[in-house]
């Protein structure tokens, strides 16, 4: 790699760019150059290690970060896959979801859509939204999904009145989503994990 690439980086950043064997973690505050390091690392892999850009996957949490990485990497002439965790999982599920009985044209429900489904599930179960906040129910289901706890597993762990209500609502919520050929944001991650585990 020409030195002009590295001159913009401090010694620690240069080490991160040049290390290609084994895992590496970059911990730093906002605005400290993490995205720059990743961008330069991609260019190093492509230009110096002859890595095919199609074999590089960059994943981040936010659309803003993904778009920033895409812009920087493309300015440097590369085109690896850059995505958020959710968009990557959605793409995988649209292609391979058939193995877990998902149609490729599933809808992705945002928070408001999900709250509407929670309210519908509560209505079907005759559980009052005055007694239990739909947003709290949704937050509990979201937490369960982030821990990879399915609706059937949640029932086994439910303790106390609130969790027992969530345990009743969770499967009805999932059933409504399924009937609508929809996934919520947490399902994108959860279903992808299940897909990989089962196949």
Each language-model region and where it sits:
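Small-residue (primarily alanine) positions within well-ordered alpha-helices
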Residues: 16, 28-30, 58, 65-66
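A basic/glycine-biased coupling hinge at the interface between accessory DNA-binding modules
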Residues: 3-4, 21-23, 43-199
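Walker A/P-loop
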Residues: 21-40
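Pre-Walker A adenine-sensing motif
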Residues: 7-18
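Conserved RecA-like helicase ATPase core segment
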Residues: 2-8, 34, 40
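Glycine-rich phosphate-binding loop at the start of an alpha helix
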Residues: 10, 39, 186
């Amino acid at each position: 790699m020409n030195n002009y690439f590295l001159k913009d980086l401090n010694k620690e950043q240069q080490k991160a760019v040049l290390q290609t064997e084994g895992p590496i973690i970059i911990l730093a505050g906002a605005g400290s150059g993490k995205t720059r390091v990743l961008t330069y690392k991609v260019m190093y892999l492509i230009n110096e290690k002859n890595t095919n850009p199609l074999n590089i996957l960059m994943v981040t949490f936010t659309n803003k970060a993904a778009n920033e990485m895409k812009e920087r990497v493309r300015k440097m002439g590369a085109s690896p896959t850059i995505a958020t965790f959710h968009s990557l999982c959605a793409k995988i599920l649209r292609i391979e979801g058939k193995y877990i009985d998902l149609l490729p044209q599933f809808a992705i429900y945002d928070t408001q859509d999900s709250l509407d489904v929670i309210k519908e599930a509560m209505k079907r179960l005759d559980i009052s939204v005055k007694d239990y906040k739909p947003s709290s129910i949704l937050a509990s289901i979201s937490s369960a999904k982030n821990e990879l706890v399915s609706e059937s597993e949640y029932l086994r762990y439910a303790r106390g009145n609130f969790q027992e209500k969530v345990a009743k609502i969770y499967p009805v919520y999932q059933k409504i989503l399924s009937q609508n050929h929809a996934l919520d944001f947490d399902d994108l991650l959860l279903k992808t994990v299940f897909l990989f585990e089962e196949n």
